Regions:
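Acidic, metal/ion-coordinating pockets
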Residues: 2-110
Length: 110
């Protein structure tokens, strides 16, 4: 299932003639970032925040670590606790894709 969330203000932007768009590839994040962060992340956040549409492919499933990996999902089970979403908020993404090859790593409940 793909979930697309567009804020009302984007409808006005889309109806205009130009928008700025930043897209990043797979975010495969399975733990929170260190409190001090990493070198260069603040600059990356500024770059991402400079666009009106900020898209990321969330390659990791987000859940509370209950359940077991689905045995037929391919052997690489991507999972992160919901707390990693707090770190992702720092980068101001406003559009996520969650439909990918890891969507069923923990079956229907994951």
């Amino acid at each position: 299932m793909t979930v697309i969330y567009l804020e009302k203000r984007f409808l006005k932007i889309i109806m205009g003639s130009q928008i700025s768009f930043t897209a990043v590839g797979d975010i495969f994040m399975n733990r929170m970032l260190p409190e001090a962060g990493y070198e260069g992340l603040s600059e990356l956040s500024e770059l991402i925040s400079s666009s009106e549409v900020r898209f990321a492919n969330l390659e990791t499933t987000i859940h509370d670590r209950e359940g077991y990996p689905f045995p037929f999902s391919g052997g690489t089970w991507a999972m992160a606790h919901p707390s990693v979403l707090d770190d992702l908020k720092k980068y101001n993404f406003n559009l996520y894709n969650a439909a990918n090859n890891h969507s069923m790593d923990y079956s229907h409940n994951g």
